[in-house]
Curated annotation (Swiss-Prot):
<keyword id="KW-1133">Transmembrane helix</keyword>
<dbReference type="GO" id="GO:0015556">
    <property type="term" value="F:C4-dicarboxylate transmembrane transporter activity"/>
</dbReference>
<keyword id="KW-0813">Transport</keyword>
<feature type="transmembrane region" description="Helical">
    <location>
        <begin position="1"/>
        <end position="21"/>
    </location>
</feature>
<comment type="function">
    <text>Responsible for the transport of C4-dicarboxylates during anaerobic growth. Catalyzes the uptake of fumarate, malate, aspartate or D-tartrate coupled to the export of succinate. May function primarily as a C4-dicarboxylate transporter during fumarate respiration. Required for anaerobic growth on D-tartrate.</text>
</comment>
<feature type="transmembrane region" description="Helical">
    <location>
        <begin position="362"/>
        <end position="382"/>
    </location>
</feature>
<feature type="transmembrane region" description="Helical">
    <location>
        <begin position="233"/>
        <end position="253"/>
    </location>
</feature>
<feature type="transmembrane region" description="Helical">
    <location>
        <begin position="91"/>
        <end position="111"/>
    </location>
</feature>
<feature type="transmembrane region" description="Helical">
    <location>
        <begin position="171"/>
        <end position="191"/>
    </location>
</feature>
<comment type="similarity">
    <text>Belongs to the DcuA/DcuB transporter (TC 2.A.13.1) family.</text>
</comment>
<keyword id="KW-0812">Transmembrane</keyword>
<protein>
    <recommendedName>
        <fullName>Anaerobic C4-dicarboxylate transporter DcuB</fullName>
    </recommendedName>
</protein>
<feature type="transmembrane region" description="Helical">
    <location>
        <begin position="22"/>
        <end position="42"/>
    </location>
</feature>
<keyword id="KW-0050">Antiport</keyword>
<dbReference type="InterPro" id="IPR004668">
    <property type="entry name" value="Anaer_Dcu_memb_transpt"/>
</dbReference>
<feature type="transmembrane region" description="Helical">
    <location>
        <begin position="419"/>
        <end position="439"/>
    </location>
</feature>
<feature type="transmembrane region" description="Helical">
    <location>
        <begin position="138"/>
        <end position="158"/>
    </location>
</feature>
Length: 440
């Protein structure tokens, strides 16, 4: 390994670290700064931009943001709330099932924010330690991203692997069952995590603290949201678009044919989701300003800018040193290709973006000759958000759990989400790798 490669690699890592600390569009712009150093300073030729990935994400975000502005996300949250309140005794299993399903349908984990107070309230009122369902609900909302046909990370994987004959249906046949089974197995363990609520010393202290008297006396923590007919229509249209994406991904023969080949999946997703966004705007007439002010639009555009900068930076470095990198990791790729999961996990911890992680490392995995079944099997490893407790829903859950059972420990990493996250990761990876070798 040359000193020049190590120096340039250190620059890339520094840009990722600083960009992640800055937050917002930090990853993207610091990726651009790193690219300026590599190109102007070291003379590296910039790699090709991940245009297809960026455009697919923008198309999906446009449709999802229109749905949110039309009240569709509120409607989905209302349904989720009803499900949680009807099954209080099994909330450690029901809560993650709800956040997993609604993240899969919406392509974003933002639904978790709104159901967390419901989970906290229902579990406390039924004497269940809120830490258990809260932690698994947050983890499930992350892991469901790899199972959603309209999530940024999934459309990116499809774009990279389609030249190898891998279609959307192939990816989902692995990620959907592996995340369902993996999360369920993790729930079995987490259901016994920590002391029972009635025996928890912090909760008992708060019960006797006058400051918490009004909070614990309250029986409602979320107001009922009125849902309009147009909100329901927007959800129906959005889910119809998602279904079309799945069908055309699973059956390329139903796509238009040009020069003897079916239309590429990138263009298919872009056309379908932009059209769905247009239909939502025409039929539901949401406020045009609200579309671009919503949380879905902001998060989606941040992901696009992150991929623009960081993925471009990483690809530029790897293309310049691909021969050296291949030689360096050749033995590892041949003997333990699954070890690529560690790289995905570590980068996802740093960048807090599944889409950016895929766009940065999947081209490297393909260039190194890692088989597509292995790449799909370890895809779930892009969900390392939980390792450092700075992810939005993690912070939110600490505030919503008034019992104090959901917490960050003295040493930062000994937090409520570490064990649920590691268990979920282990089981999902194990099942995902097994399924990918059987199915693909």
């Amino acid at each position: 390994m040359s000193a020049m490669f190590l120096l340039q690699f250190a620059i890339v890592l520094l840009c990722i670290f600083v960009g992640a600390r800055v937050g917002g569009i930090g990853l993207g712009v610091f990726g651009g700064l790193g690219l300026a150093i590599l190109s102007f300073g070291f003379g590296l030729k910039p790699a090709g931009l991940p245009i297809d990935v960026m455009f697919m994400i923008m198309a999906v975000v446009a449709a999802a943001a229109a749905m949110q502005a039309a009240g569709g996300l509120d409607y989905m949250i209302k349904i989720a709330t009803k499900i949680l309140r009807r099954n209080p005794k099994h909330i450690t299993f029901i809560a993650p099932a709800v956040t997993w399903l609604f993240t899969l349908l919406a392509g974003t984990g933002h639904v978790a924010y709104s159901v967390l107070p419901v989970i906290a309230e229902v579990s406390r009122q039924n004497g269940i330690r809120p830490e258990r369902p809260m932690s698994m609900a947050v983890i499930a909302s992350q892991f469901a991203i790899v199972a959603s046909p309209i999530a940024a990370a999934v459309v990116a994987v499809v774009a990279y692997l389609e030249p190898q004959g891998i279609h959307l249906g192939d990816v989902l046949m692995v990620t959907i069952p592996s995340t369902i089974l993996g999360l369920f197995l993790a729930c079995l363990f987490v259901n016994k995590m920590g002391k029972e609520l009635k025996d928890d010393p912090e909760y008992q202290r708060r019960l006797n603290d006058p400051k918490y008297a009004d909070i614990f006396a309250s029986t409602t923590s979320v107001k009922e949201v009125e849902v309009s007919k147009t909100a329901k229509i927007s959800v129906s249209l959005f889910l119809f678009g998602a279904l079309l994406v799945v069908l055309m991904g699973a059956a390329p023969s139903i796509r238009p044919v040009f020069d003897g080949k079916p239309m590429g999946m990138a263009h298919t997703i872009e056309i379908i989701m932009l059209s769905i966004g247009a239909l939502i705007i025409l039929t539901c007439k949401p406020d045009g300003t609200a579309i671009t002010k919503g949380s879905v639009f902001h998060a989606g555009m941040r992901a696009v800018i992150a991929i623009f900068g960081i993925a471009w930076l990483g690809d530029t470095l790897m293309q310049a040193h691909i021969t050296e990198v291949k030689e360096m990791v050749k033995g590892l790729v041949e003997t333990a290709p699954w070890a690529f999961a560690f790289a995905l996990f570590v980068l996802s911890v740093l960048v807090n973006s599944q889409g950016a992680t895929v766009a940065t490392l999947f081209p490297l995995g393909i260039a190194l000759g890692i088989p597509a079944p292995v790449l799909i099997g370890v895809f779930v490893a892009v969900n390392g958000y939980f390792f450092i407790p700075n992810y939005g829903p993690i912070i939110a859950s600490l505030d919503f759990d008034t019992t104090g059972t959901t917490k960050i420990g003295k040493y930062i990493l000994n937090h409520s989400f570490m064990l649920p996250g590691l268990l979920s990761m282990f089981f999902c990876l194990l099942i995902g790798l097994g399924l990918s070798h059987v199915i693909l």
